[in-house]
């Protein structure tokens, strides 16, 4: 079994707590209040509640860190400390259409000399399947405890490529 860093443990714990609420809301998706942020860019009460839970849980663990939030903008923290980057419901279109492929995404961005920043840790948690994908700088990428590898294939005709593009209504 691969050991997580303390940071990843904090991230996964927060994602699982928020994910349990998303699972519940996913079962009640037809009753959610939905508004539009922009063309084909929906935000639901579930987005906002999930983000609130994540912020609360992560602030408990790292109270002086800031946040860059998809729904809530920026919450300033100590500029010499890392900050959290959060997409509380990555795949809102799928969620709102009853398609069980959506996730909670959390990253850690470390401050560097000269005002630059570097993303060093990331976690993607899929609440419906209870799967976690994570990566840490210099440790590689993982699905649960299984190391992920880059394919050696070079011919695009031999590759499997998938993408999701939400409907862009005009």
Write out the residue ranges for each language-model feature.
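Glycine-rich, flexible loop/turn motifs
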Residues: 28-30, 38-39, 63-64, 98, ...
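Glycine-rich active-site/cofactor-binding loop and its immediate structural neighborhood
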Residues: 80-128
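Acidic beta-strand-loop-alpha-helix segment within the catalytic core
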Residues: 107-170
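N-terminal subdomain of lithium-sensitive/metallo-dependent phosphomonoesterases centered on the IMPase/IPPase/PAP
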Residues: 1-89
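Short coil/turn motifs at beta-sheet boundaries
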Residues: 77, 97-99, 154-156
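Hydrophobic alpha-helical segments
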Residues: 12-16, 47-48, 102, 119, ...
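Residue-level signal for inorganic ion chemistry
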Residues: 22, 47, 58, 92, ...
